[in-house]
């Protein structure tokens, strides 16, 4: 259910873009993200930091898009989110004692420190690459291609990278955890 909720605003954005335009899609994205946030609070009595940050960025960049009637703001939102994710991962890698990935998954998985560090760095580089790809596609290709890339391309890339991360983790699990 939670994964469905995470993707709901993206599906709403895509549907409104196909039915109307980027501005209707942006409005729908803001509303859908707010509804998901409210639902999460009512249902789980908890709002994850990432969801709150995403909502704030959607509201700010979406609001600027609507206020100035300029789609460049909503296009930048994707890169800003990826830059924040990459930055958080890199700061945790080089400044804090534990990589962020380890903080998120370390209770469920026993992995060597080197594996956590490599996984954390790999995700940071992945987010940087996605942010750069978004800049190129958003500002040098037609809007409809960017929307398709945002909805399908980035989602597919994230799924593939998640699967590859799972394979990498599995290879480094202690034997007793693999069963």
Swiss-Prot record:
Coiled-coil stretches: none
Gene: yciB
Highest taxon above the source species: Bacteria
Pfam families noted in UniProt: IspA (PF04279)
Subcellular location: Cell inner membrane
Record flagged with keyword Cell membrane: yes
The protein's name in its UniProt record: Inner membrane-spanning protein YciB
Family statement: Belongs to the YciB family.
Organism listed in the record: Salmonella typhimurium (strain LT2 / SGSC1412 / ATCC 700720)
GO cellular component, one term: plasma membrane
Alphabetical UniProt keywords: Cell inner membrane, Cell membrane, Membrane, Transmembrane, Transmembrane helix
